[in-house]
Amino acid sequence: MFRLIITLAIIFGTISCYATDVGEVISKAIKNSSKIKSQFYQYKSAEKYYKSSGLAGFLPDISLQYNFDSNFNLDTSEKKLTLRQKLIDGGGTFATFSRSSHLLKAEKMRFQQSKQELALNAVKAYVSVLQKTEILKLREHKERVSLEHLSAMKKRFSLGEVTNAEVLLAKAKFSSSISERVDAEGKLKLANIAYYHLIGEDADDLSEANDKLPSVPELNECLQLAKTNNLSLKAAVYQKRAAGMEVIAESSKWLPSLNLSASKNFGEDGMKVDKLLENVHVVFTLDVPIFKRGVNAFGVSKAKMDAKKSTYDYYETVKKIEQDVVNAWNNVLTAKAIIKAIQEAEKAASLALEGVEQEVNLNLKSTSDLLDTEDALFKARSDLVEAKSNYVISVYNLLFMINSINL
């Protein structure tokens, strides 16, 4: 019996972490996610909108006008082609273009954030399947050991070496091991279902990782990387810059603007390319705004309020990211320390089990002592599997936070 447990310990001791196919799993999750596809097209829609609104101020307005009489009859004797172009507007056009560019970049950062969130969930789903698989193996082995104990107790009871109470205790332990195995099977099924829904395929070909996890930088380097690479912080920066450009765009509405208007009338002969530039009526208009229903004043005031809000939002984001990075980095260290502590506890439980088995054979300890010691070893093994899973998740959570993994 002890050899079986030692063999199990050797098998599980070879598992260093769950990360061999994480990159492939992340790619499949992103590729198969309907949510990501939806957000991709949402981003593309925003891209079209911001690009068109940013460029619109630089482009002319061209129209062809027809006249109708009171009976809605088309007057074919006269048509008018008009071109209007804003030449100078106090920098409003450039500010609007820059604002649209910053808003588009912020939208892109949010889309990348969605991919990071999905990637981390994919890591969790991958690790969960592996964790639940190993837990089930432990529960199945515990059930076999409990059955072996029960059989041994029955034989010893028939020989008068143990009491009926010890046999009943072994039966209770066996029944408990069955319920734990059934519970582990149910949790593994749920983990497989969650994996399928997220990744888009069954978790049949997963294997434990033998390669090392991506390296984790020191805390100061993580903080520096987060300040330059964190997607939430980048989005806040672009939002702040866009708000500043909006103030310039609204303020420019108070400044004079110079507009060009060119028009040409066409008779019944219609439009001819070779005569298109003849008799063109060109007008330059200098527009000096004085009062436009108060819209300009309120527009500037609102833009300034939005700029202040974006600035304070940026400061709050900086503080939050710093706290989150420190917390994530500490979680990595804590998970690593827990693994080491549980490994030591596992070794101690293995040695304790060996000693208790010898004492039971010498009738120095009871069967209940042996079963309790075995439970301690199984618990240490289960805790170790969970600790390694938590370590993998904490590492990827930190790496996504400092944006050191390209998606």
PLM segments and residue spans:
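Bacterial Sec-pathway N-terminal export signals of envelope proteins
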Residues: 12, 18-61, 87, 163, ...
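Transmembrane beta-barrel architecture of outer-membrane proteins
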Residues: 76-78, 124, 169, 279-281
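Short segments within alpha-helical structural elements
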Residues: 176-201, 346-404
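Short, charged, amphipathic alpha-helical segments
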Residues: 101, 164-175, 301-304, 367-378
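Sec-dependent N-terminal signal peptides
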Residues: 4-13
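Residues on the lipid-exposed face of transmembrane beta-strands in outer-membrane beta-barrel proteins
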Residues: 81-85, 195, 284-288
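Small/polar (Gly/Ser/Thr/Ala-rich) solvent-exposed segments
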Residues: 37, 60-76, 86-113, 234, ...
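Periplasmic alpha-helical coiled-coil/stalk elements that build and connect Gram-negative outer-membrane
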Residues: 20, 115-228, 328-331, 335-339, ...
